[in-house]
């Protein structure tokens, strides 16, 4: 099911770039604990960015994970890549509902008392390693 979600999401990106032979028709990134929420293509660097609820990945076009941000305290969802400033802008929901409480429990962080909505800004060029922490790394 997770593979299907990734392939479906990629289909939209690939379809939008039809006629560009350097793009694969699918990218498999291995088993993730959550389902894909958002994707963005960085043609200049030849990679993609993917959000998986509380995890953000930078992957090459073969699906190899180049860098990751883990323990994002909330629900990281839809996103877009701005090629001019080289940043990803993504919706980040910190909700006090059952889903938000489950995310907080899995990450062993405090549960929010009211829902909050943000735009997460990720400097993808500062993503250099796996398991980066959004609070302790300058990303």
In which residue ranges do the predicted regions lie?
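Sec-dependent signal peptide recognition
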Residues: 1-9
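Hydrophobic h-region of N-terminal signal peptides that target proteins for export
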Residues: 8-17
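Surface-exposed loop and turn segments in beta-propeller and other repeat-based domains
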Residues: 23-29, 125-139
């Amino acid at each position: 099911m997770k593979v299907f979600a990734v392939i479906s999401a990629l289909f939209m990106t690939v379809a939008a770039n039809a006629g560009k032979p350097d793009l694969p028709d699918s990218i498999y990134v291995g088993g993730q604990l959550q389902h894909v929420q958002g994707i963005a293509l960085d043609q200049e660097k030849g990679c993609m960015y993917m959000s998986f609820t509380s995890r953000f990945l930078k992957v090459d076009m073969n699906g190899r994970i180049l860098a990751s941000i883990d323990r994002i305290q909330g629900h990281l969802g839809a996103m877009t890549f701005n090629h001019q400033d080289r940043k990803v802008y993504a919706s980040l929901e910190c909700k006090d509902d059952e889903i938000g409480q489950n995310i907080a429990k899995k990450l062993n962080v405090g549960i929010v008392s009211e829902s909050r909505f943000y735009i997460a800004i990720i400097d993808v060029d500062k993503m250099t390693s796996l398991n980066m922490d959004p609070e302790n790394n300058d990303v």
